[in-house]
């Protein structure tokens, strides 16, 4: 069914892929991504595990209303989270050889 040494090779490849995935998961968790809103007036920097590292608010917004500022912060965080997801997909595609995951399955495992 697998040919000579086929099963052994397949197991070895699976182990190598698992090791690469583990290393990549650590790399992603430690990366930082910045999202912006209000044409860069609000910036939120988060890690690959979605922990907020920094929130930068332009001085000009301190005089505006509180609700608008809250909306801009939320939008900047959402932009950063979207960028993390995109980066994860790109990096994981390199490890999985572009193989698509089944629907509903998220990385890292």
From Swiss-Prot:
Binds to DNA and alters its conformation. May be involved in regulation of gene expression, nucleoid organization and DNA protection. Belongs to the YbaB/EbfC family. GO terms for cellular component: bacterial nucleoid; cytosol. This is Nucleoid-associated protein VS_0917. It comes from Vibrio atlanticus (strain LGP32). It is found in: Cytoplasm, Nucleoid. InterPro entries: YbaB-like_sf, YbaB/EbfC. Residues 1-22, 88-109 are annotated as: Disordered. Pfam families: YbaB_DNA_bd.
């Amino acid at each position: 069914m697998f040919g000579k040494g086929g099963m052994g090779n397949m197991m070895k490849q699976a182990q190598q892929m698992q090791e690469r995935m583990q290393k990549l998961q650590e790399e992603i968790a430690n990366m930082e991504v910045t999202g912006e809103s209000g044409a860069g007036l609000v910036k939120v920097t988060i890690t690959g595990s979605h922990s907020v590292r920094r929130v930068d608010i332009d001085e000009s917004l301190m005089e505006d209303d509180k609700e608008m500022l809250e909306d801009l912060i939320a939008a900047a965080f959402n932009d950063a989270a979207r960028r993390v997801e995109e980066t994860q997909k790109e990096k994981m595609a390199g490890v999985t050889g572009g193989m698509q995951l089944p629907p509903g399955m998220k990385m890292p495992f």
